[in-house]
Amino acid sequence: MYVAALFFLIPLVALGFAAANFAAVVRKPEGTERMKEISSYIRSGADSFLAHETKAIFKVAIVIAILLMIFTTWQTGVAFLLGAVMSASAGIVGMKMATRANVRVAEAARTTKKIGPALKVAYQGGSVMGLSVGGFALLGLVLVYLIFGKWMGQVDNLNIYTNWLGINFVPFAMTVSGYALGCSIIAMFDRVGGGVYTKAADMAADLVGKTELNLPEDDPRNPATIADNVGDNVGDVAGLGADLLESFVGAIVSSIILASYMFPIYVQKIGENLVHQVPKETIQALISYPIFFALVGLGCSMLGILYVIVKKPSDNPQRELNISLWTSALLTVVLTAFLTYFYLKDLQGLDVVGFRFGAISPWFSAIIGIFSGILIGFWAEYYTSYRYKPTQFLSKSSIEGTGMVISNGLSLGMKSVFPPTLTLVLGILFADYFAGLYGVAIAALGMLSFVATSVSVDSYGPIADNAGGISEMCELDPEVRKITDHLDAVGNTTAAIGKGFAIGSAIFAALSLFASYMFSQISPSDIGKPPSLVLLLNMLDARVIAGALLGAAITYYFSGYLISAVTKAAMKMVDEIRRQAREIPGLLEGKAKPDYNRCIEITSDNALKQMGYPAFIAILTPLVTGFLLGAEFVGGVLIGTVLSGAMLAILTANSGGAWDNAKKYLEAGNLEGYGKGSEPHKALVIGDTVGDPLKDTVGPSLDILIKIMSVVSVIAVSIFKHVHLF
């Protein structure tokens, strides 16, 4: 009873904290009438897109839920819908906050002319998204655990279940897989839809506004300016929040699935009797342990967030954000050590599942995950921040022309793949050394255990960026834009760590889900056989090799589709901007207003049209290949997708980020003799335009592709293991 109360209490407190912060921000003044007008344009555009997107998503979600109920269990379908609702709720709440906080940040900067008060409003607004991600994710998972796991007895019955179609699975593993899939589907739609929206508007605004019309960033004469600012909220707040919520849930669920299948797999046949090598009590503790771990992390995140909100405003935003993030991380590390030891210390059979140092073993794996995430974040910052040589060199190469910018940007991205990959390799090996495959899953959870703070920091950046756009469009004092730009720059630096955690956790979780895929193939006839014979994928099997090739190819086709989706929408926007510049008298002189709504309609319509196909690729690839060629082929597909997708995600994120910051390096006055409007600047604007869909659409979506394909495969493997054409 007390445990159940604790389970509910922490997510509810987090959501209550988010509601309090929402109310506190909304009470702050919005500024001048012009500021209110611009803010209302951004807010209505974002709300309209999100409403249409949500309707489209839930039509698909209901169909998937019905299919899950038919082919697996009704509990899986219900859990899927719950995951979709929780993920969508976090995105809606976070974006509504962001579109209300932006103008209030600009007003705080305008009235005080200080960084501290503006930082406080921006971070308090961002914390609503962060707390919503942690709160809604864990509230849904706790409901699944308590209702289906405890009340309906799925955690007590860990034997293989055979449903009416003859499909074999462990019921609770199937149910939590449904919850994870619900979160993943929302993340895919939000990331793709938001990514197409924001980058199409961004590309069009840059291509015409900066290079043809010589208009500065966020100039009110540019018809795409409002759409660009709407896109920041749709893609960088709602999309990012759904992405990290899905990663967070995926890390927890992969741990639960692995633990659930340990009971039927670790069985020894002695004579005619089957003896479980790992007691049921141990398995049940390993199932609930990752949920407790995540709850502790959420509690620590609230303390880290509270530090910035209650403290006296500071003019050093980098220090404040770092203290918030590392306070959350340090508290999580310390408190989870106590949790791990006292929760697992009396359990038997831990050595059988790979715990090398007894009860404390998974905590070591979690620490490996945290340090791996920090290191991957450092590499992301090293290759993309203009404080370091790679991006400085890229910026200087613009003097030689656009071709050199593109070539050097690609070279930088390719070279940047190696250090984080080596970090991942070592992290996986050490996590596995401490606690086996379960430890690898816990390492992913360790990276994201303080996700509420990470998302708060990441969401603060787009809010500050929007505030800068509003100040520019309202022609406020240049000092206001200077303050918001400083806040945005700090957010971009800190967000590099967040991207490292997102990419790293995706790979760790994908490996755990792949192990879950192998575990999920077990049938009642396999019980008692050595695990090494049951969990076998023959790399010399032609089906496995062929599947790996197809899986690798899928990631490139998927990426190509996303880039073309962005560019098609951007081309329509470019035509519209040119039309308005040509046909609206006095527009470029500032004597007439552009038709902002027409640009919003174009980007919104195209984003909504393009977001469904990538999700169907992710869902149908394992299903179609599985029913055609069987479980071994799908195992190969997953290997190819993970390996190729991980490398491509790092490459696109870092090339795109470097092109963006190389442009900012010149704009900051670091290339003597060359400023805005010069030929090197135009070359860097083109490089930034090329990188836009790579870093903010392709890279993040690849992470989700990997996890959706893995979860769908885990759910369906027991079907196409026995039912396939060839």
Curated annotation (Swiss-Prot):
Name the coenzymes or cofactors required: Mg(2+)
Temperature sensitivity?
Answer: Optimum temperature is 70 degrees Celsius.
Q: Where in the cell is it found?
A: Cell inner membrane
Per the record's keyword annotation, is Nucleus included, yes or no? no
Membrane topology of the entry: Multi-pass membrane protein
Q: Where is this site: Determinant of potassium dependence?
A: A495
Q: What class of enzyme is it?
A: translocase
Q: What is its main location?
A: membrane
Q: Which residues bind Mg(2+) 1?
A: D202, D206
Q: Which GO terms describe its cellular component?
A: membrane; plasma membrane
Query: What catalytic activity does the UniProt entry give for this protein?
Result: Na(+)(in) + diphosphate + H2O = Na(+)(out) + 2 phosphate + H(+)
Task: Site Important for ion transport: give positions.
Answer: R191, D236, D243, D696, K707
Q: What does this protein do?
A: Sodium pump that utilizes the energy of pyrophosphate hydrolysis as the driving force for Na(+) movement across the membrane.
- PANTHER family recorded: K(+)-INSENSITIVE PYROPHOSPHATE-ENERGIZED PROTON PUMP
Q: What is known about its subunit structure?
A: Homodimer.
Protein name, as recorded:
K(+)-stimulated pyrophosphate-energized sodium pump
Instruction: Give the organism, scientific name.
Output: Thermotoga maritima (strain ATCC 43589 / DSM 3109 / JCM 10099 / NBRC 100826 / MSB8)
